[in-house]
Curated annotation (Swiss-Prot):
Function of the protein: E3 ubiquitin ligase that, together with UBE2N and UBE2V1, mediates the synthesis of 'Lys-63'-linked-polyubiquitin chains conjugated to proteins, such as ECSIT, IKBKG, IRAK1, AKT1 and AKT2. Also mediates ubiquitination of free/unanchored polyubiquitin chain that leads to MAP3K7 activation. Leads to the activation of NF-kappa-B and JUN. Seems to also play a role in dendritic cells (DCs) maturation and/or activation. Represses c-Myb-mediated transactivation, in B-lymphocytes.
Glycyl lysine isopeptide (Lys-Gly) (interchain with G-Cter in ubiquitin) crosslink location in chain: K124, K319
EC number: 2.3.2.27
Any one annotated GO CC term: cytoplasm
Subunit-level organization: Homotrimer. Homooligomer. N-terminal region is dimeric while C-terminal region is trimeric; maybe providing a mode of oligomerization. Upon IL1B treatment, forms a complex with PELI1, IRAK1, IRAK4 and MYD88; this complex recruits MAP3K7/TAK1, TAB1 and TAB2 to mediate NF-kappa-B activation. Direct binding of SMAD6 to PELI1 prevents the complex formation and hence negatively regulates IL1R-TLR signaling and eventually NF-kappa-B-mediated gene expression. Binds to TNFRSF5/CD40 and TNFRSF11A/RANK.
Gene: TRAF6
Keyword list, A-Z: Coiled coil, Cytoplasm, DNA damage, Immunity, Isopeptide bond, Lipid droplet, Metal-binding, Nucleus, Osteopetrosis, Repeat, Transferase, Ubl conjugation, Ubl conjugation pathway, Zinc, Zinc-finger
Compartments where found: Cytoplasm; Cytoplasm, Cell cortex; Nucleus; Lipid droplet
Protein known as: TNF receptor-associated factor 6
Source taxonomy: Eukaryota, Metazoa, Chordata, Craniata, Vertebrata
Length: 522
């Protein structure tokens, strides 16, 4: 560590009858074998080809033996169970029968409870090993029942819904259907290039705004969206009313004949116009005149309101400017008072100041990201009267030469209230300490003592609020040492500075601390 002068800041089965003990033993012996040979999902085949509450509705080859038929649904046993009276049923069928028809066997009406049913794994394995035909039309594949579901998932003859028209088609044909035959396949309009469904293309063609159409009057070919303007403004043979139709002329003619009509009927048109003007002059209190007067009165009222609103806006603007000036003065007063309070607090330190640096984890993260971290403490006084000082903490970057990942700590002199009454340059001893915040009886603080060097600029009377020259340690403490003890608590680092001027320097030496040798400052 070196002391340097620094430059500017950087439902199981419960009972069985005797007649079923042998069968139960046989079933349990077959359970392990069946669980290995079968597929776990085969017992609950997809409902796409059979109902969950009934047996297997598939075609067996050879045909299914009657001993494997459920007496209730008359299909192959699904999840076969056996009763104490020796009959076999689909598990779902017999449970539904017991709950709906009562606690009795459907075959012999013997008393039967649900907890008396036990799985017939022997029959289940036998049934799952039977050969069945694929139920999809056109597929000739045969397989064991246990493999039917897997086959169904990949069978090219299985029916799937077209994603466009929702109609079912066999899987091998669906792609051809989507591309060539589907009425909802997307096709491009030859005129506007818009994508439309094939079955809607005819309707789109009849309304496409860019389709070519022929004018019914002059046979000119235009695109559809231009046709309305063509009819209203350009078509030479479109029928239009006379310009004086409002005044009583009811003639209609082709647009290219309008000029001749106006020329030939000038006198009659003038008579119509004169009659219309004369009629208006005879009705001074007509609805139009009354409406105009109402509009004029409304406009006059609105103009008056507008003037009043303008006056109010001007008054409010003037008041706002006055208030803004007043608020600015209050803010300046508050800042002045805050500075005075801070100055008074700084004077109460009597040479011992503890600097609390919060959010220190954020500063460490910035240092790891190689962002410069330089923090200044508030000012504090060595006494009253006394010198005003502050501390500067600098987290050196990982790439810094000779001081990488170190905490640098410096002291700066500041302009204070008593500078004119104090001897300069500053002379005294400064103890810098990073406090151990652990709960241990004996705390191991990290501290250093340095003597002021009056010949350095760092201890001359400052000519600006804070002396840019500082004095302290470039390698005060390594960041690894900072993490080894509880120097950081609640994301806060505590730095203590104790200053003894030349009037009370003996106190530090009596405690046994001797200042370390220093390097010449810049």
């Amino acid at each position: 560590m070196s002391l340097l002068n620094c430059e500017n800041s950087c439902g199981s089965s419960q009972s069985e009858s005797d007649c079923c003990v042998a069968m139960a033993s046989s079933c349990s012996a077959a359970t392990k074998d069946d669980s290995v040979g079968g597929t776990a999902s085969t017992g609950n085949l997809s409902s796409s080809f059979m109902e969950d509450i009934q047996g297997y509705d598939v075609e067996f080859d050879p045909p299914l033996e009657s001993k494997y038929e459920c007496p209730i649904c008359l299909m192959a046993l699904r999840e076969a169970v056996q009763t104490p009276c020796g009959h076999r049923f689909c598990k779902a069928c017999i449970i539904k029968s017991i709950r709906d028809a009562g606690h009795k066997c459907p075959v012999d009406n013997e008393i039967l409870l649900e907890n008396q049913l036990f799985p017939d794994n022997f029959a289940k394995r036998e049934i799952l090993s039977l050969m069945v035909k694929c139920p999809n039309e056109g597929c000739l594949h045969k397989m064991e029942l246990r493999h039917l579901e897997d086959h169904q998932a990949h069978c090219e003859f299985a029916l799937v819904d077209c994603p466009q028209c929702q109609r079912p088609f066999q899987k091998f044909h669906i792609n051809i259907h989507i591309l060539k035959d589907c009425p909802r396949r997307q096709v491009s309009c030859d005129n506007c290039a818009a994508l439309v469904a094939f079955e809607d293309k005819e309707i789109h063609d009849q309304n496409c705004p860019l389709a070519n159409v022929i004018c019914e009057y002059c046979n000119t070919i235009l695109i559809r969206e231009q046709m309305p303007n063509h009819y209203d403004l350009d078509c030479p043979t479109a029928p239009i009313p006379c310009t004086f139709s409002t005044f009583g002329c009811h003639e209609k003619m082709q647009r290219n004949h309008l000029a001749r009509h106006l020329q030939e009927n000038t006198q009659s048109h003038m008579r119509m116009l004169a009659q219309a003007v004369h009629s208006l002059s005879l009705i001074p209190d007509s609805g139009y005149v009354s409406e105009v007067r109402n509009f004029q009165e409304t406009i006059h009222q609105l103009e008056g309101r507008l003037v009043r609103q303008d006056h109010q806006i001007r008054e409010l603007t003037a008041k706002m400017e006055t208030q803004s000036t007043y608020v600015s003065e209050l803010k300046r007063t508050i800042r002045t008072l805050e500075d005075k309070v801070a100055e008074i607090e700084a004077q109460q330190c009597n040479g011992i100041y503890i600097w609390k640096i919060g959010n220190f984890g954020m500063h460490l993260k910035c240092q790891e990201e190689e962002k410069p971290v330089v923090i200044h403490s508030p000012g504090f006084y060595t006494g009253k009267p006394g010198y005003k000082l502050c501390m500067r903490l600098h987290l050196q970057l990982p790439t810094a030469q000779r001081c990488a990942n170190y905490i640098s700590l410096f002291v700066h002199t500041m302009q204070g209230e008593y500078d004119s009454h104090l001897p300069w340059p500053f002379q005294g001893t400064i103890r810098l300490t990073i406090l151990d915040q652990s709960e241990a009886p004996v705390r191991q603080n990290h501290e250093e003592i340095m003597d002021a060097k009056p010949d350095l600029l760092a201890f001359q009377r400052p000519t600006i609020p804070r002396n840019p020259k500082g004095f302290g340690y470039v390698t005060f403490m390594h960041l690894e040492a900072l993490r080894q003890r509880t120097f950081i608590k609640d994301d806060t680092l505590l730095v203590r500075c104790e200053v003894s001027t030349r009037f009370d320097m003996g106190s530090l030496r009596r405690e046994g601390f001797q200042p370390r040798s220093t390097d010449s400052g810049v």
